[in-house]
Each structure stands twice: as structure tokens, then as C-alpha cells.
């Protein structure tokens, strides 16, 4: 696997439960999958861990709140992020509104990818062509490898 390089900085996508990164081996409700329906994405984002909000102005965010803001940086506009940053720093943040906005922006980000995957999976003829090309390429590579193996072993019968 190759790490996704976003603006020359490696991106760690934080989980929705505030306990590290999103991972298929972790809490299923804290991870957004490209195959998740729009409603499932909204449901998962709305269950993201939050608290009652900051008690004092300009206090540092707890890790689980910082995770939500990191997710927003991946899919939300700069104006949206700035509005919620200001709300947080002024102790007027409404996490329900923040999560609704994040959920909609996440749906808008993931839906086109999911739709493209579904279109590819539903194109049986296209998939057959891809598999045929892959098989031809693998067969060619395997034949070359076997030729080298036979030469190395002195089994050049063909």
C-alpha cells in the first residue's frame, strides 16, 4: 500500500470515537467506509464522541474534539471550519450543528466515489475485459519467469 500524500503531509484520518485512526479492524461505528450509505454515514458522524463544550474561551480542544476538526479539514470548506473554530473559542459551539455539517460534507465527499465503484461493479462486460487483460499480463509474466527457471535448472526442452 502507498500512503496518501495530501499537500506533502501524510494524512491520518481520525476515528469518530476519538481513539486513534479510522481502521477496518477497530470499532465499526467509528469508521466511515466508502460503501456506507448516506444515512449510515450521517448516523456514524452523529454518534461521534463530543462533550458539553468548552467552559472557558480559547481553551485547547480535547483529542476527540480535535479529531472532529481534523475530519472537517479533509472535507469542509475553510469558511465552515473557521465558523466552528470561532464558535468553539467563544464557547458557543453547538456540536449537533457541527456534526450535521460534517455529516453532509462527508456524504458529499464519499457519495461520488461510492457511485463510481458501484458503476464499475455493475459493468460486467467491463470487468470481464479488465480480468482478461490482467490474466494475459500475468500469463506473459509467468511464462517469462518459467523460461528463466527452466534455463537455470537446465530443463530447456521447449
Kindly give the residue locations of the regions a language model identified.
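Conserved nucleotide- and phosphate/pyrophosphate-binding catalytic cores
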Residues: 1-158
